[in-house]
Amino acid sequence: MVSKEKINRINELARIAKERVLTKLEEEEQQILRKEYIEAFRKSFRKQLDNIELVD
Protein backbone atom coordinates (compact mmCIF):
# COMPACT_ATOMS: atom_id res chain seq x y z
CA MET A 1 0.00 0.00 0.00
CA VAL A 2 1.22 3.47 -0.85
CA SER A 3 1.60 5.82 2.10
CA LYS A 4 -0.66 8.82 2.58
CA GLU A 5 2.36 11.12 2.19
CA LYS A 6 3.16 9.70 -1.24
CA ILE A 7 -0.45 10.07 -2.38
CA ASN A 8 -0.43 13.67 -1.16
CA ARG A 9 2.79 14.29 -3.09
CA ILE A 10 1.26 12.80 -6.26
CA ASN A 11 -1.69 15.17 -5.89
CA GLU A 12 0.60 18.11 -5.14
CA LEU A 13 2.64 17.47 -8.28
CA ALA A 14 -0.56 17.23 -10.32
CA ARG A 15 -1.69 20.63 -8.99
CA ILE A 16 1.72 22.13 -9.75
CA ALA A 17 1.59 20.70 -13.29
CA LYS A 18 -1.71 22.52 -13.90
CA GLU A 19 -0.15 25.83 -12.84
CA ARG A 20 3.22 25.57 -14.55
CA VAL A 21 5.58 23.19 -16.31
CA LEU A 22 7.20 20.67 -14.00
CA THR A 23 10.99 20.59 -13.72
CA LYS A 24 12.82 17.48 -14.88
CA LEU A 25 13.25 16.32 -11.28
CA GLU A 26 9.57 16.86 -10.53
CA GLU A 27 8.57 14.95 -13.68
CA GLU A 28 10.81 12.03 -12.72
CA GLU A 29 9.46 12.04 -9.16
CA GLN A 30 5.89 12.12 -10.48
CA GLN A 31 6.52 9.18 -12.81
CA ILE A 32 8.12 7.12 -10.04
CA LEU A 33 5.31 7.85 -7.58
CA ARG A 34 2.60 7.13 -10.15
CA LYS A 35 4.25 3.86 -11.13
CA GLU A 36 4.49 2.81 -7.48
CA TYR A 37 0.83 3.73 -6.91
CA ILE A 38 -0.38 1.82 -9.97
CA GLU A 39 1.64 -1.27 -9.02
CA ALA A 40 0.14 -1.22 -5.51
CA PHE A 41 -3.36 -0.73 -6.94
CA ARG A 42 -2.97 -3.62 -9.37
CA LYS A 43 -1.62 -5.90 -6.64
CA SER A 44 -4.54 -5.06 -4.36
CA PHE A 45 -7.09 -5.43 -7.17
CA ARG A 46 -5.61 -8.76 -8.25
CA LYS A 47 -5.85 -10.00 -4.66
CA GLN A 48 -9.53 -9.02 -4.55
CA LEU A 49 -10.21 -10.77 -7.85
CA ASP A 50 -8.42 -13.91 -6.67
CA ASN A 51 -10.67 -14.02 -3.60
CA ILE A 52 -13.92 -13.84 -5.58
CA GLU A 53 -15.84 -17.08 -5.63
CA LEU A 54 -18.62 -17.60 -8.16
CA VAL A 55 -21.71 -19.38 -6.91
CA ASP A 56 -24.26 -20.94 -9.25
From Swiss-Prot:
Annotated coiled-coil positions are none
One cellular component term (GO) for this entry is: cytoplasm
Pfam families listed in its UniProt record: DUF896 (PF05979)
Keywords for the protein's UniProt record, in alphabetical order? Cytoplasm
Principal place of residence: cytoplasm
Keyword Nuclease on entry = no
Q: Where in the cell is it found?
A: Cytoplasm
| Keyword match Mitochondrion | no
Tell me its family: Belongs to the UPF0291 family.
Q: Which HAMAP family match?
A: UPF0291 (MF_01103)
Question: Which protein is depicted?
Answer: UPF0291 protein Clos_1191
This protein's species is Alkaliphilus oremlandii (strain OhILAs)
